[in-house]
């Protein structure tokens, strides 16, 4: 009975605490999210916490970290909590940097790439380095990401630096001071997550079934590129991927690997609009048309570890032209 009484007391205390947080506007919205297996909050707001006693404002919006999604994808908590202590990142890494975090600023901790492997202990990963690792190692991502690098502009930053507009200046100030109540933090995070909408993919039926590449037909017959088949395959591979859904926030983005360096569009210009048959003397760094085709096709196949067609077998993609009777 003692154990039973203790359990009842613990349950009563937990319910009372939950009621208090709900009364303060804390966990009501957060409860709408699926709970994590670890017991950590399903989502939290990561504020740019600084060392200054009363900082004013911040250069960037806070980041809402969806702990639930990441927990499902990562086997070991120490992948992110590399010290083994599951505390907030800003405990050691602040805007200015502090001794506890080897003076590595919050910005570096979240965005650093090419992190050197530690001789002992866990090698830290940043948000950006982990995402980049995923796009390089997973076949469904590597095909495109092996040949293009996303432009790191304001739109790229806003994928993560995005929070509900209902957050007040007072809450922002408390957040960067490190004094925002956990319940209020989780409520803001949940509201942001619940407001996110998945971008509807473009229908493959809008794309050409085949594209005849004949601009360079000479020794070989025109190449019949199975455009819709390639597009459908790519879409099928990433349709349920949360990382792709987050960064492919416009349906045309999937087209932008091949149809690069032009405005996002479902009707992009032809490759020959920019790439000429001969090297353009005014733009010597721009590949000619034949090089552009082969860099794209072979680069994607290599990134996805596609065994066929082989780079050395020209007739797999375009048959040899019949020899003239002469």
From Swiss-Prot:
<feature type="binding site" description="covalent">
    <location>
        <position position="80"/>
    </location>
    <ligand>
        <name>heme 1</name>
    </ligand>
</feature>
<keyword id="KW-0732">Signal</keyword>
<feature type="binding site" description="covalent">
    <location>
        <position position="271"/>
    </location>
    <ligand>
        <name>heme 7</name>
    </ligand>
</feature>
<feature type="signal peptide">
    <location>
        <begin position="1"/>
        <end position="30"/>
    </location>
</feature>
<feature type="binding site" description="covalent">
    <location>
        <position position="77"/>
    </location>
    <ligand>
        <name>heme 1</name>
    </ligand>
</feature>
<feature type="binding site" description="axial binding residue">
    <location>
        <position position="227"/>
    </location>
    <ligand>
        <name>heme 6</name>
    </ligand>
</feature>
<dbReference type="Pfam" id="PF02085">
    <property type="entry name" value="Cytochrom_CIII"/>
</dbReference>
<comment type="function">
    <text>May form part of a transmembrane redox complex through which electrons are transferred to the cytoplasm for reduction of sulfate.</text>
</comment>
<dbReference type="InterPro" id="IPR002322">
    <property type="entry name" value="Cyt_c_III"/>
</dbReference>
<dbReference type="GO" id="GO:0009055">
    <property type="term" value="F:electron transfer activity"/>
</dbReference>
<feature type="binding site" description="covalent">
    <location>
        <position position="89"/>
    </location>
    <ligand>
        <name>heme 2</name>
    </ligand>
</feature>
<feature type="binding site" description="covalent">
    <location>
        <position position="130"/>
    </location>
    <ligand>
        <name>heme 3</name>
    </ligand>
</feature>
<feature type="binding site" description="axial binding residue">
    <location>
        <position position="131"/>
    </location>
    <ligand>
        <name>heme 3</name>
    </ligand>
</feature>
<feature type="binding site" description="covalent">
    <location>
        <position position="144"/>
    </location>
    <ligand>
        <name>heme 4</name>
    </ligand>
</feature>
<feature type="binding site" description="covalent">
    <location>
        <position position="314"/>
    </location>
    <ligand>
        <name>heme 9</name>
    </ligand>
</feature>
<feature type="binding site" description="axial binding residue">
    <location>
        <position position="301"/>
    </location>
    <ligand>
        <name>heme 8</name>
    </ligand>
</feature>
<dbReference type="InterPro" id="IPR036280">
    <property type="entry name" value="Multihaem_cyt_sf"/>
</dbReference>
<keyword id="KW-0677">Repeat</keyword>
<feature type="binding site" description="axial binding residue">
    <location>
        <position position="145"/>
    </location>
    <ligand>
        <name>heme 4</name>
    </ligand>
</feature>
<feature type="binding site" description="axial binding residue">
    <location>
        <position position="259"/>
    </location>
    <ligand>
        <name>heme 6</name>
    </ligand>
</feature>
<feature type="binding site" description="covalent">
    <location>
        <position position="160"/>
    </location>
    <ligand>
        <name>heme 5</name>
    </ligand>
</feature>
<comment type="subunit">
    <text>Monomer.</text>
</comment>
<feature type="binding site" description="axial binding residue">
    <location>
        <position position="161"/>
    </location>
    <ligand>
        <name>heme 5</name>
    </ligand>
</feature>
<feature type="binding site" description="axial binding residue">
    <location>
        <position position="294"/>
    </location>
    <ligand>
        <name>heme 9</name>
    </ligand>
</feature>
<feature type="binding site" description="axial binding residue">
    <location>
        <position position="230"/>
    </location>
    <ligand>
        <name>heme 8</name>
    </ligand>
</feature>
<feature type="binding site" description="axial binding residue">
    <location>
        <position position="93"/>
    </location>
    <ligand>
        <name>heme 2</name>
    </ligand>
</feature>
<keyword id="KW-0574">Periplasm</keyword>
<feature type="binding site" description="axial binding residue">
    <location>
        <position position="260"/>
    </location>
    <ligand>
        <name>heme 7</name>
    </ligand>
</feature>
<keyword id="KW-0249">Electron transport</keyword>
<feature type="binding site" description="covalent">
    <location>
        <position position="300"/>
    </location>
    <ligand>
        <name>heme 8</name>
    </ligand>
</feature>
<keyword id="KW-0349">Heme</keyword>
<feature type="binding site" description="covalent">
    <location>
        <position position="127"/>
    </location>
    <ligand>
        <name>heme 3</name>
    </ligand>
</feature>
<feature type="binding site" description="axial binding residue">
    <location>
        <position position="81"/>
    </location>
    <ligand>
        <name>heme 1</name>
    </ligand>
</feature>
<feature type="binding site" description="axial binding residue">
    <location>
        <position position="275"/>
    </location>
    <ligand>
        <name>heme 7</name>
    </ligand>
</feature>
<dbReference type="InterPro" id="IPR020942">
    <property type="entry name" value="Cyt_c_III_dom"/>
</dbReference>
<dbReference type="GO" id="GO:0042597">
    <property type="term" value="C:periplasmic space"/>
</dbReference>
<feature type="binding site" description="covalent">
    <location>
        <position position="157"/>
    </location>
    <ligand>
        <name>heme 5</name>
    </ligand>
</feature>
<keyword id="KW-0813">Transport</keyword>
<feature type="binding site" description="covalent">
    <location>
        <position position="274"/>
    </location>
    <ligand>
        <name>heme 7</name>
    </ligand>
</feature>
<keyword id="KW-0479">Metal-binding</keyword>
<feature type="binding site" description="axial binding residue">
    <location>
        <position position="318"/>
    </location>
    <ligand>
        <name>heme 9</name>
    </ligand>
</feature>
<feature type="binding site" description="axial binding residue">
    <location>
        <position position="111"/>
    </location>
    <ligand>
        <name>heme 5</name>
    </ligand>
</feature>
């Amino acid at each position: 009975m003692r154990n039973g009484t203790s359990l009842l007391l613990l349950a009563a205390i937990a319910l009372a605490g939950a009621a208090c947080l709900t009364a303060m506007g804390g966990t009501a919205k957060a409860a709408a999210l699926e709970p994590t297996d670890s017991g950590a909050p399903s989502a939290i707001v990561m504020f740019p916490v600084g060392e200054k006693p009363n900082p004013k404002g911040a250069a960037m919006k806070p980041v809402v970290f969806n702990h639930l999604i990441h927990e499902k994808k990562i086997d070991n908590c120490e992948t992110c909590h590399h010290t083994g202590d599951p505390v907030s990142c800003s405990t050691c890494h602040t805007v200015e940097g502090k001794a506890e975090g080897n003076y590595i600023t919050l910005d570096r901790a979240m965005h650093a790439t090419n992190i050197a492997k530690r001789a002992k202990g866990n090698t830290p990963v940043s948000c950006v380095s982990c995402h980049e690792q995923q796009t390089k190692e997973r076949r469904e991502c590597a095909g495109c990401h092996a040949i293009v690098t996303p432009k790191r502009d304001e739109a790229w930053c806003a994928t993560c630096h995005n929070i509900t507009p209902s957050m007040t200046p007072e809450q922002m100030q408390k957040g960067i001071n490190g004094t925002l109540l956990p319940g209020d933090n989780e409520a803001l995070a949940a509201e942001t997550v619940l407001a996110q909408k998945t971008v509807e993919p473009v229908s493959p039926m809008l794309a050409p079934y085949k594209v005849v590449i004949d601009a360079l037909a000479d020794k070989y017959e025109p190449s019949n590129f199975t455009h819709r088949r390639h597009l459908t395959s790519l879409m099928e591979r990433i349709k349920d991927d949360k990382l792709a859904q987050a960064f492919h926030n416009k349906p045309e983005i999937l087209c932008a690997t091949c149809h690069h360096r032009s405005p996002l569009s479902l009707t992009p210009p032809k490759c020959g609009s920019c790439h000429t048959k001969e090297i353009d003397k005014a733009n010597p760094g721009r590949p000619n048309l034949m090089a552009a085709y082969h860099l794209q096709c072979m680069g994607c196949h290599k990134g996805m570890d596609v065994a066929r067609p082989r780079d050395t077998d020209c007739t797999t993609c375009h048959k040899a032209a019949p020899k003239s009777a002469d």
